[in-house]
Amino acid sequence: MEFNEDEFEKYLTEAIDSVPSQYASRLQNVAFILEDYPSPEQRLKLNLYPNETLFGLYEGVPLPARNGTVKLLPDKITIFKQPLQAASRTPAQLRENIGHTVWHEVAHYFGLDHTRIHELDIKRHNKSKE
């Protein structure tokens, strides 16, 4: 489904603003970027097949791997608009998909791997049912 740019950016801003304060306060020197699709270089770096979809990408040095030196260039979290729109049938689903993608990429910033992120996703999902 096609959503307008303002609506998408509103949901993205909401998702970034909803990062819990104990994590948001530790997000330093991170740029959130909105692109239509992953670049050929990003797809190649991740060894993505042509039919694979990517909603977001964290590029940088995860917080636990840093040695205390100051970085001049920011880490980057890129959110990919077209794949998220294609996977969303309603505005509510788009909002949820953007929120989950932002949370997922922020988790990578904090050094979490996909296994741990999946475990936390299950906990978050179960908690939201309570």
Report residues per predicted region.
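A metal-dependent hydrolase signature that marks the N-terminal structural subdomain at the beginning
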Residues: M1-N67, L72, P83-A86, P91
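Walker B catalytic acidic pair
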Residues: E105
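Active-site scaffold of zinc-dependent metalloenzymes
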Residues: N51-G99, Y109-E130
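Walker B beta-strand of ABC/ABC-like P-loop ATPase nucleotide-binding domains
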Residues: V102
